[in-house]
Amino acid sequence: QKRIGGYDELRRYFGKKVKAEGATSYQPVLAVFGVSALLALAVGWMLGGLFTIRTAELFIAFSMSILALLKLQDVESFSTMFLNYDLLAQRHVRYSYLYPFGELLAGVLMVAGALLWIAIPVALVIGTVGAISVFKAVFIDRRELKCACVGGSSNVPLGFVSLTENLMMMGMGVWML
């Protein structure tokens, strides 16, 4: 009788595919965007309009807030990963610690539709700096880095998803001007 311990070992025993140690995955980001979309649709339903511009605004604001929450779980780890590619954080390390708080502030204020004179510039600054930084790291320098977008302990590859996050923040800031 063979003793099998652990989920991965059980999958191997039955001939199933086992995810390689340290393999990259978009699953955490897909979960965030999926939950954000469902929340936005639920609030849209409550407000009487399921597929409206406000629902799209809420989707982006909820995404920003949830992504910020994931970063705030371990700010130190996030900061370490963020310093690998963010141009402003490389010049001013303190920015890497303030970034998740700024993203959360902008997201929550956008959900509430309150104090937009604070939310808009914060979203524009962090979104623009982030988009430029990701574009430079991935498409110009051709570096293969892990994205700090869902916190510091993820294996999400830096690239399209992080660029999308930053472009969504920029777009939301411009839209709400």
Enumerate the predicted regions with their spans:
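Membrane-interfacial helix-loop segments of redox and metal-homeostasis proteins
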Residues: 19-177
